[in-house]
A protein has these predicted regions:
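Bacterial N-terminal signal peptides that target proteins for export
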Residues: 1-11
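Predominantly soluble domains enriched in secretory-pathway, periplasmic, or organellar proteins
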Residues: 4-5, 15-362
Length: 362
């Protein structure tokens, strides 16, 4: 089994405190901005009101994405390693300390994250799969293969009946839908029972019992290198940022068809997020200092906002009317006002920031 360096694992498992990292102790706000540093291997806890980092905690090497538990007390970080590593780092946000890692075993390359009630949904690139970890039992209790290469980012609908993933190297989007299947019939080769005068007996097929739940997958081809994506606030459309083609693919979720392929010339596009009102889509690019802004109604570029020398993670702030953009080459998170579409501040969260998330303590 592949592992990352043992010193890091022991460092995390020991529950290292913020005092050990030389940080002054401050209470974690009820609502916190979480930001990863890929270079420093840390998670920063930021006060969104003051934009000050109040604490940092260690995570494993090559951290990419972060998400908070539904109660806002714990953070989970995917330790990616280009598909080699197999761990989720765990941070106690109240105690501001690292907890023992979650070993994902053969589910190598965890990356995209989402919450499913009290559980954590994650992609596993190396296994071409998605899976769910249950913190209550400390077990992975569900795995579903996609059959696609580099299953990277993931989204689950609010009713938890559909899951969407981008599959970078297959240039596809997977739509996994929860379906109910009829009872199974008798085993192969078994002689079916006969009803009156040789007719089939009434009722469901024998041998199968009750209807059962399963998942049905629809695979939709999109532009090459699709990675970042988002679902419109009304749930009608899914847009992907296709890094290799430089295009944006627009999928109608009702028909499950590509409505449009926009020639955005967005080579290297890494993330795409809709504004809370759904009127704009923001696209970050790894090798370009401008944040692209698209009008979703016309599906045309609306503006570009200079934010630095390249960017990755995007996080919307519905309460504050802001977007936070992780600018890796510049070692800061840019704060963008969504009304003026201008940069209003920067946050030093550590070297090469990437994954961003909210934690709201219940």
């Amino acid at each position: 089994m592949r592992t990352y360096p043992i010193k890091t694992s022991l460092f995390l498992a020991a529950g290292v405190t913020l005092a050990a990292m030389g940080a002054a102790a401050q209470s974690t706000p009820q609502r916190s901005l979480l930001a990863l540093s890929k270079r420093d291997h840390t998670l920063a806890i930021v006060d969104p009101g003051t934009l000050q980092v109040i604490a940092r905690a260690p995570v494993g090497p090559d951290p990419h994405e972060v998400i908070a538990s539904s109660d806002g007390k714990t953070a989970y970080v995917s330790i990616y390693g280009g598909g080699r590593y197999h761990a989720l780092s765990v941070i106690d946000l109240v105690g501001q300390k690292a907890l023992p890692d979650v070993d994902t075993g053969a589910l190598n390359g965890p990356h995209g994250l989402a919450t499913v009630s009290e559980k954590i949904l994650f992609t596993a690139e190396g296994a071409k799969a998605i899976a769910i970890y249950d913190p209550a039992t400390s077990k992975i209790d569900w795995i579903m293969g996609t059959g696609q290469n580099r299953t990277h980012m993931v989204y689950i609908t609010p009713d938890q009946k559909q899951i969407y993933t981008t599959n970078v190297s297959s240039a596809t989007v997977s739509i996994l839908e929860k379906v109910t299947l009829p009872p199974m019939g008798p085993p192969p080769g078994a002689r079916p029972p006969q009803g009156a005068q040789g007719s089939p007996p009434p009722g469901p097929p024998p041998g199968g019992g009750q209807p059962r739940m399963d998942w049905s997958e629809t695979v939709i081809p999109v532009g090459k290198g699709d990675e970042g994506f988002d679902v419109s606030p009304d749930g009608r459309e899914l847009w992907t940022a296709d890094a290799q083609d430089g295009t944006l693919s627009v999928i109608d979720l009702a028909s499950r068809k590509v409505l449009a392929t926009l020639d955005a010339k967005a080579t290297g596009a890494n993330r795409l997020k809709f504004t809370p009102d759904g009127k704009l889509a923001l696209i970050s690019r790894l090798g370009d200092g401008d944040l692209m802004v698209y009008d979703t109604a016309s599906r045309k570029e609306f503006k570009r906002v200079h934010i630095g020398h390249g960017a990755a993670g995007i996080l919307m702030d519905k309460e504050g009317g802001r977007a936070f953009i992780a600018c890796g080459p510049d070692n800061y998170v840019a704060v963008v006002d969504l009304k003026t579409l201008s940069v209003t501040g920067h946050i030093d969260v550590g070297g090469e920031p990437d994954g961003l998330a909210w934690a709201t303590r219940q």
